[in-house]
Amino acid sequence: MLRYLSAGESHGKGLIAIIEGLPSNIPMDINRINADLGRRQQGFGRGNRMKIEKDRVEILSGVRDGKTLGTPLTLMIENLDYKNWTSIMSVEKLEKQNIIVEPRPGHGDLVGSLKYNHKDIRNVIERTSARDTAIRTAIGAVVKQFLSIFDIEILSHVISIGRAHYVPFVEDLFQYKSQIEASPVRCLNPTIEERMMGEIQRAKETGDSLGGVFEVIVRNVPIGIGSYAHFDRKLDGILAQGLMSLQAIKAVEIGNGIEGSSKMGSQFHDEIKYSEAKGYYHDTNRAGGIEAGVSNGEDILIRGYMKPIPTLMKPLKTVDMGTKEVKEAIIERSDNCAVPSAAVVAEGICAFAIAKEFLEKFRGDSIEEVEWNYERYMNYLRSR
């Protein structure tokens, strides 16, 4: 079974992940991992920490001679900012501490302090921080290299930021991937891009933050990934859980799910067609590539709805956890909009979910064994 564990604090020495369950002999290019880490750091609205960190991954185990070994693969990303936090983040007993007791509305400060009985909110901030998304991006970049063997491609773009909303005007966004990557907000439409950047700038000038919506598209996933047999094996449920675990994501949509809630069934469902060349297919994709928790061969479309970042330069009112007096929430260094960055992280999250279920179906200890199982299944589909 493909799984991972990650560890590390935002201002600690670094971030670590151990990935278990990858087959052996997958070609692994560290430059592709670092490229995704660089993409995560970009985007209009990012904070000053991106000027400090130059994220590069180190592979500590599980890869030799450019290929996976089939054993646990360990990744590490150094936090360059740690040198500025050595006294605060020391593992030894601190002689003097500046205790943080003013929780931010919308963040994990209050609930984390109460759940784990912390007197200092710093102990919560360090793990709830979106700095964790760096290692999740690296994990995603690893499994993307596995999926690419089977021509599975992943793309993300931003649909809205604040009041600036974009409706895609092309059918195949993969043809415009380079233009999306070149956009500071990952938006293909230059006019809407300017509006999005204007929204972010206005929020920054008033000490506020902004959320938005991004879409991830996964192409060439074969029919049959996921299962309707049990609730926890449904592919859309697995994808939704993955995205909901990403910091600040408050809603997830598969295909045209929200729009479909107000339509007749005859207007929403995708008619099934067949041809010798394509096999079974659909001309429309309102289901978002998943039916009954199982991939149907069309592009998988999933959207993440991101709330505004809770850290505000003009903070909201809160309660001092020591005195119970009304105070202003703490100000922690932060982005004021991270929707473009979240879209990149979401690619990796979706990649991991797809890879996990892909290996569940085509399991093997080596990539060659997985390919054999995959080819037999694809031949079976062609015979139907």
From Swiss-Prot:
E.C. no: 4.2.3.5
Gene Ontology, cellular component aspect: cytosol
Pfam families in UniProt: Chorismate_synt
Lineage of origin: Bacteria, Bacillati, Bacillota, Clostridia, Peptostreptococcales
Enzyme class: lyase
UniProt name for this protein: Chorismate synthase
GO process terms (BP): amino acid biosynthetic process; aromatic amino acid family biosynthetic process; chorismate biosynthetic process
Catalytic function, reaction form: 5-O-(1-carboxyvinyl)-3-phosphoshikimate = chorismate + phosphate
Cofactor note: Reduced FMN (FMNH(2)).
Stated role: This reaction introduces a second double bond into the aromatic ring system.
Entry binding sites for NADP(+): 40, 46
One MF annotation (Gene Ontology) recorded for this entry: chorismate synthase activity
Entry similarity comment: Belongs to the chorismate synthase family.
Organism the protein comes from: Alkaliphilus oremlandii (strain OhILAs) (Clostridium oremlandii (strain OhILAs))
Quaternary data: Homotetramer.
Alphabetical keyword list: Amino-acid biosynthesis, Aromatic amino acid biosynthesis, FAD, Flavoprotein, FMN, Lyase, NADP
Originating gene: aroC
